[in-house]
């Protein structure tokens, strides 16, 4: 029997729900008005991912439980793939991805899997793959392969474009010299978004921000 979460115990829900729903108009689920931080805390107390889905927070909770469970990547992959249709909002992809537990012995297998997953026809699943790569696999050795996947994307999905822009800005923060060449190769709108994210970031030096004008 699915677990029904009582979100009513959390304070200030109405205000938070309105705010979340403005940020996630694409979600078919209304917000319960509970922060992602609180959802993550709750996920640590529940092992069963059979959650009754009534609110966006229920979706986040289910995904975080699946992602954070300590098990082999082969086991986790099956459960993740069953969850992919529930990536109905950027908040779902971006909340689940950072919590993903991958055993050290499975890192290479997982990396190859998510590299391939960037090609998924569903834009939200593809976004999830890019966010996972950004958070778990971005190194000086992997950046070229990851960015080559990014420049290959042709999409009308604003949320996928924004996800790739976020990835690109993260690459530029950590590896500006290696990332610079990719701005001109990206979809024009993605490149524009990525540059703006870099300009807005306090982690990009003034010199690196100036360099963006020539990219």
Question: Where on the chain are the PLM-derived regions?
Answer:
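Alpha-helical scaffold domains
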Residues: 1-215
